[in-house]
Amino acid sequence: GVQSSYILWEGIENLGGKVYVTIPDRIKDGYGVNEQLVEAAIEEGADTILTCDNGIAAADALKRAKENGLTVIVTDHHEIPFCEENGERKEILPDADAIVNPKQKDCAYPFKEICGAVVAWHLIRVLYDMTGKGMKQADVFIENAAFATIGDVMELQHENRILVKEGLKRLNQTKSIGMRSLIASNKLDLGGIKAYHIGFVLGPCLNASGRLDTAKKALLLLKTKDEVDAGKLAEELVELNTSRKALTEKGIEDAMQCIETQGLSEDRVLVIYLPDCHESIAGIIAGRVRERYHRPVYV
């Protein structure tokens, strides 16, 4: 959600809006908007809650926002929760003034497999058009939408393929001080950035801050206009990613040892207890173990 948060933050500020951005702490808050975050927004005097890359499954939390008179706008790309009534699926949608999600049953948007940052970008394009700024002005966010499309491992079909091609072209000429600093801190050359570098070098650096520290560092890197601050933040993110990789490799080794020493290798489902594993990398470890043993893995 870092790229989508940046697109909405920068895009709305460019229209004169006052924005306060909150990214849930992976450990303390869990995923997405919750009642504690809504209560904090109410106490701060916010009049609108705008979600990005989440919110479609946060009906209870957003109901609280509506009860307190806030405007609620949900932008998301995840599947819509549903229940079955009389053999038919019924969507469970949050109480919101507007929901922007191509996965909705009645949404006429032709291509459904876009990431949350692309949804956010389309919203900003429409806002720019409606306010007279001009939809073309939102093209500055194409590199961010493309970055997120690659990082979220979306299918490179239809508009995603076009977006990534154009986004890579723009990223290699980026004027973003934060992005240029991140590229330099990873000892990469501006002008030679490919999808691989986003998926396996730059993207993991942005994600590492949310796993081991706070995702706000990654967001502030994209937002900053100060070269010194950008350099410091970029170096911190590279260090966090290095730590994340070391912790992941250690976790994988411990998981493999656990399987072998406890005789789990023949189990149809692998359940592995790693008491010292950092919660935020358990999923990565489980994925790597699954690649070796070809069966469901819980860590």
What is each model feature region?
Residues 1-48, 68, 86-87, 95, ...:
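Hydrophobic helix-and-loop "lid/oligomerization" segment in the mid-to-C-terminal part
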Residues 42-113, 117, 121-130, 140, ...:
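Active-site cavity-forming subdomains of large catalytic enzyme subunits
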